[in-house]
């Protein structure tokens, strides 16, 4: 299983913080490190969402997080120097010349970006080896349509819920089992605020796990609440390396109260 450290916006636009994140995630067991290639000038203004998130405020925020081409090249170099695969999420699918010039082997499209197929997205214009797309905001018929559009492409589907953090009752990890019937490479982009859901998905046999990653305090970044620390990322990597039986025993281990109850009920009646 490949473990993605999603660095997202947790670098706060600082290249040195970003490079430190790459090193720390590599040391913690990440196979892939991912950023988000956000360009503020591609942001659209929609009046119906101004009360939810004002355009001017969002533009200013994204501008402060934007990475230059030189920053992205340095990110790629740092990743490769630390033996992890660099990856990015693209938000402007028509800017293929930009991404091709950077040389990413792994690209990601979010669920809502996959609808770009309806507007003429041509993946054959991109130079990449593997594509990842998440199911956030996609209905089942949309997912099937994406699979049809990706014939001949090496890709992984990530089960994903577009809630930050995702409450337990909304995780719907059973979806992973159904996605396995549609495609052979299935993963999970986990936006929960714990490790249990990730471990459960690993036990279910996913091929790829994505977790937001931070080296800063939770309150210092926008995605802090759904981000794992280096220690937590290492815990997930260690769990993924267990045998299936080892994973089962870890997930189903008895705590002190369970052991007490077991011993109590075991001797409760005479045989």
Language model regions located:
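Catalytic cores and adjacent flexible loops of soluble metabolic enzymes
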Residues: 1-271
């Amino acid at each position: 299983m490949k473990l993605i450290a999603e660095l997202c916006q947790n670098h706060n636009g600082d290249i040195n913080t970003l490079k430190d994140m790459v090193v720390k995630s590599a040391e913690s067991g990440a196979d892939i490190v991912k950023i988000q290639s956000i360009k503020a000038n591609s942001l659209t203004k929609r009046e119906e969402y101004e009360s939810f998130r004002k355009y001017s405020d969002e533009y200013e925020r994204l501008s402060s997080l934007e990475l230059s081409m030189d920053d992205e090249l340095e990110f790629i170099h740092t990743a490769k120097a630390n033996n992890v695969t660099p990856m990015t999420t693209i938000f402007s699918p028509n800017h293929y010349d930009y991404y091709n010039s950077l040389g990413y082997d792994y690209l990601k499209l979010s669920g809502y970006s996959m609808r770009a197929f309806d507007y003429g997205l041509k993946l054959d214009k991109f130079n990449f080896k593997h594509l990842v797309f998440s199911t956030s905001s996609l209905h089942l018929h949309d997912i099937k349509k994406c699979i049809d559009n990706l014939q001949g492409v090496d890709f992984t589907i990530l089960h994903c819920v577009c809630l930050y953090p995702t409450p337990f009752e909304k995780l719907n990890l059973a979806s992973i089992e159904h996605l396995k019937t549609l495609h052979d490479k299935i993963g999970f982009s986990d936006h929960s605020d714990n490790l249990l859901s990730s471990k459960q998905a690993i036990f279910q046999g996913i091929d790829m796990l994505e977790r937001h990653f931070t080296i800063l305090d939770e309150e210092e970044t926008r995605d802090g609440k759904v981000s794992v620390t280096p220690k937590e990322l290492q815990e997930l990597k260690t769990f993924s390396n267990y045998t299936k039986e080892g994973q089962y025993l870890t997930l189903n281990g008895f705590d002190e109260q369970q052991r007490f109850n077991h011993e109590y009920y075991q001797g409760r009646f005479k045989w």
